[in-house]
Amino acid sequence: MRKFLNLIVASLALLTASCSKTLINTTESVGTLKAKNSTATVINEWNSNPYKLNVIYFVPNDVDSIPNFRKRLSRILLNAQNMFANNMDREGFSRKSFGLDLVNDTLINIHYITGQFGKATYPYSGGNGAVKTEVDAYFGQNPLAKKSEHNLIIIPTYNTDPANPGGPPFYGTGTSCYALDYVNLDAKNLGIGGDIGWKATVWIGGMIHELGHGLNASHNRMNKTLAPTLGTALMGSGNSTYGISTTSLTSSTAATFNNSQVFSSVTRSDWYASASAEIISLSSSFTNNTIIISGKFTANKPVNDIVVWHDREPFGGNNDYDAVQWATKIIGQDSFRFECPLADFYDLTGNYEMRIG
């Protein structure tokens, strides 16, 4: 986890699913799929990633799964995997992306977990804790199935009206994130217009936005001068543009993903172990309509990338979708410098909080 240490308004961080009620066809069971495809050659670009996103389909015992969920969710996540790689490449990190546990090049291994309780135990507000407890128990009993510390947990809608899906947890907490499934959650519906197309953008875009949180990213906004070409930031309001108009990773999101376990090409034993960092000097100046920030830090683990956010009031939490941001590599072993042109800010009035991570 990234560890934040407050220094006035700045901080430094190391970026370092079966039950009788289900509608799933028995031929979709993981064992059957694995057996059928045991000789398949997987050529997915990120198949060699040593860590892979755990994708879980969690079904409360009084809710039905949604037909064809494996194929639909596989296409959505494979598309996102490629989109992330294109953005990482643009930001100078090569075509890195999150690993997926694949049955073949078009199908993801999705863990199906039947909940011990009904949907009332897993509400939107606060229900993630009960879900996560059962997911942890599942991986405790199946340790080889766990491919990383990162979980995407998808829960079928509690409301069976396809025009009004909702009910389960839908947010990111720590290295896990939660999203929902419903009958029209299908990549083919992105951009088709009408209510079906709009809801596909909201719920698919929302899933990928929450996945970003589950991969350690925070909210931010595309800098103003980049918006005409890069569009909307995924980790800003990209859940309302995904599949309709250009939606991109910002430089800060890409830098964060560069230090995420499931993007790594090497194994480590200390992922998200306790870390400490401190800014020991910080200075700023203003020249040529540009805010210049520089400083030095100490840390007990290597630092690869540093990010600064300028968040206009109200600050933080779910009020930071409008935070413009910059990312940079460290200078030497302990220094950083940012240049933040005013042309990249959308509103030059009011108060801002600066955060460094």
Where are these regions (language model features)?
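Propeptide-to-catalytic entry region of secreted or membrane-anchored zinc metalloproteases
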Residues: E28-H150, I155-G167, P314-S335, P341-A343
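Active-site rim elements
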Residues: I66-P67, G191-T201, M222-N223
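Bacterial lipoprotein signal-peptidase II cleavage site
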Residues: S20-T26
